[in-house]
A protein has these predicted regions:
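Short acidic capping loops at alpha-helix termini that bridge into adjacent secondary structure
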Residues: 140-141, 172-176, 227-232
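Hinge/beta->alpha junction and helix N-cap segments in small-molecule ligand-binding domains
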Residues: 18-28, 47-61, 84-86, 118-128, ...
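Flexible loop/turn connectors
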Residues: 190-300
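PLP-dependent class I/II
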Residues: 35-36, 75-76, 188, 297-300
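Alpha-helical recognition/docking segments in bacterial nutrient-uptake
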Residues: 1-131, 196, 200
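Phosphate-coordination loops involved in phosphoryl transfer and adenosine-cofactor binding
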Residues: 10-11, 138-139, 202, 284
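Short helix-capping segments at alpha-helix termini
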Residues: 39-42, 165-172, 197-200, 222-227
Length: 300
């Protein structure tokens, strides 16, 4: 990417724009990128805040002021943690300010034109996870707990569930699919309704994220069912909380170190050849086989 000022950039600083730093996964990834950058000889400036930016409020607007005076021309590269900010106009402004002074922009899990985009391959892993339950554990009556209706992540995972059912010649029963809105309380309500189906009980409940899966396990156990002996439960995302739950949840998780390494690879490539055209890099998710599917023995 060409430096519009035609001056060699002496700075060795990488900037990171991020929000929702109170989230353990967000702060963990930010720290992993920081450590990887330092190990590769770069300094790091983190422009971070805690508010959600997708629905602007006076409070979030105040926190967003951290992004107003970033020294773009002094940065080796700018990293936008787009899924933590979720304010498209703000992300576009930051991108344009960086590009205008020749600073390459790298996005994480949020695609923008004129940027190097680190994309996360949720779909392939989620399909493998569904196949693991149906084909690996031979479950014949799986239910699916989606997130928000219409949400891209939720609908993509629902489509994956349906696709794997059809691959295995299994019927898609709409009554076996419900929306838990990615949160614990809505997921509990849905699962409590499922508990009333004595004549059509699931032998597996596949959830679109870990938070809902943990709520489902709680409801099952409160109603006298054992996980995974009676019902297999799986989640997705690999949140920190699953480390402290019994049974340990089977889920999918991205390798944060791989994200950081891909970012460093891009930074070094652009450093060597400033005319490198922006492109996308796909980082895979991996299945973490835990206790909730029966792959690992339960330890108390």
């Amino acid at each position: 990417m060409k430096n519009e000022n035609n001056n060699p950039r002496k700075s060795n600083i990488i900037g990171i724009c991020v929000s929702q730093l109170q989230n353990h996964e967000v702060s963990g990834l930010t720290h992993t990128i920081y450590q990887c950058a330092r190990a590769n000889g770069y300094q790091v400036m983190v422009f971070g805040c805690f508010a959600k930016m997708d629905f602007p409020t006076p409070h979030s607007n105040g926190e967003a002021s951290i992004f107003e005076n970033i020294p773009m021309k002094d940065l080796k590269a700018l990293i936008l943690m787009g899924q933590t900010i979720l304010h498209r106009e703000l992300l576009l402004r930051l991108r344009d300010e960086a590009v205008a002074v020749g600073t390459p922009v790298i996005t994480v899990d949020y695609e923008l034109e004129k940027c190097f985009n680190i994309r996360l391959d949720y779909l392939s892993c989620f399909k493998r996870l569904v196949r693991h339950v149906i084909e690996g554990h031979h479950r014949h009556n799986p239910y699916f707990m989606a997130g928000f209706k219409g949400n891209a992540f939720s609908e993509e995972r629902l489509d994956a569930f349906v696709e794997v059912l059809e691959e295995n010649g299994m019927p898609v029963v709409q009554e076996h699919i419900a929306y838990g809105d990615f949160w614990g309380k809505p997921a509990r309500r849905v699962c409590e309704q499922w508990m009333e189906r004595t004549d059509d009980f699931p032998d597996a409940i596949i959830c679109a994220n870990d938070t809902m899966a943990l709520a489902v396990i709680d409801v099952l156990e409160e109603n006298g069912y054992h996980v995974p002996e009676d019902v297999i439960v799986t989640g997705f995302d690999g949140i920190e909380l699953i480390k402290y739950c019994i049974p340990r949840l089977t889920t999918g998780r991205v390798d944060q170190e791989e994200i950081a390494e891909q970012i460093m690879h891009i930074v070094k490539r652009v450093e060597t050849d400033p005319e490198t055209a922006p492109q996308s890099v796909l980082v895979p998710f991996h299945i973490l086989r835990g206790e909730s599917c029966g792959c690992a023995p339960i330890h108390f």
